[in-house]
Amino acid sequence: MKGSIFTLFLFSVLFAISEVRSKESVRLCGLEYIRTVIYICASSRWRRHQEGIPQAQQAETGNSFQLPHKREFSEENPAQNLPKVDASGEDRLWGGQMPTEELWKSKKHSVMSRQDLQTLCCTDGCSMTDLSALC
């Protein structure tokens, strides 16, 4: 009995993955959605690990992501450590740039919350690109 349930599970995941990899949208709800996202994210990490730099070299290079404008934090004047806020009340980085989160909310690069994407995948369907954005 457990074997048949496991086989059914694997078949549904493989079917969902093959559908997601196509350009068409596929409807995924509940556990199918979660399993598919985990599979997609794990497989992308596996590919990066196999194609990329060995783990030992990655540890030596350290954090490759750096903020564009480093700034010193002042212990004497903590108000200087706060982010700048413009007239609209939105946080801005030094140089008038919007934080990265706000940049991604533009129409061209819209990012939904995980719950919104899960709801969308269940009702309308979603693509591989949508799901891989969660990784």
UniProtKB/Swiss-Prot annotation:
Cell location: Secreted
Protein name: Insulin-like peptide INSL5
Top-level taxonomic group: Eukaryota
InterPro entries the UniProt entry points to: Insulin-like, Insulin-like_neuro_ligands, Insulin-like_sf, Insulin_CS
Tissues where the protein occurs: Highly expressed in rectum with lower levels in uterus and ascending and descending colon.
GO annotation, cellular component aspect: extracellular region
Quaternary structure and partners: Heterodimer of a B chain and an A chain linked by two disulfide bonds.
Key word Signal present: yes
GO MF term set: G protein-coupled receptor binding; hormone activity
Source organism of the structure: Homo sapiens
Annotated positions of the Pyrrolidone carboxylic acid modification: 115
